[in-house]
Swiss-Prot record:
Keyword Acetylation carried by entry: yes
Protein name: Congerin-1
Keywords: Acetylation, Lectin
Ranges annotated as spanning the membrane: none
Assembly, per entry: Homodimer.
Function as written in the Swiss-Prot or TrEMBL entry: This protein binds beta-galactoside. Its physiological function is not yet known.
Length: 135
């Protein structure tokens, strides 16, 4: 359950960011986060295979205060990822919302609650091995 953090990332309004890789064989969860830092996340995209009370659920949220500042979650049970499989997620955003395109899966939207136009921080954490990050 390693993690990757990229700082000084050039993810601005109108650009696309694609991350891909392989899900572990017995996953609990993995998340993709974009924002200004680990404590200021405009999008927390958490795939929960089997985590707490959640099974096969995508949870999206945001925070300006790290773990003490989580806002209202948005959830989707349109869950198409599975253990051991390749995944690819493409993100883009504008001043109002994020657009999330999961390969062979749902297209989701999430509000850009803080109206940020420059998100230099990317992190990936949890039960997946990253093989692709491209802008």
């Amino acid at each position: 359950s390693g993690g990757l953090q990229v700082k000084n990332f050039d993810f601005t309004v109108g650009k696309f960011l694609t991350v891909g890789g392989f899900i572990n064989n017995s996953p609990q969860r993995f998340s993709v986060n974009v924002g200004e830092s680990m404590n200021s996340l405009s999008l927390h995209l958490d795939h929960r295979f089997n985590y707490g009370a959640d099974q096969n659920t995508i949870v999206m949220n945001s925070t300006l205060k790290g773990d003490n500042g989580w806002e209202t979650e948005q959830r989707s049970t349109n869950f198409t990822l599975s253990a051991g499989q390749y995944f690819e997620i493409t993100l883009s955003y504008d001043i109002n919302k994020f657009y999330i395109d999961i390969l062979d899966g749902p297209n989701l939207e999430f509000p850009n609650r803080y109206s940020k136009e420059f998100l230099p921080f990317l992190s990936l954490a949890g039960d997946a091995r990253l093989t692709l990050v491209k802008e």
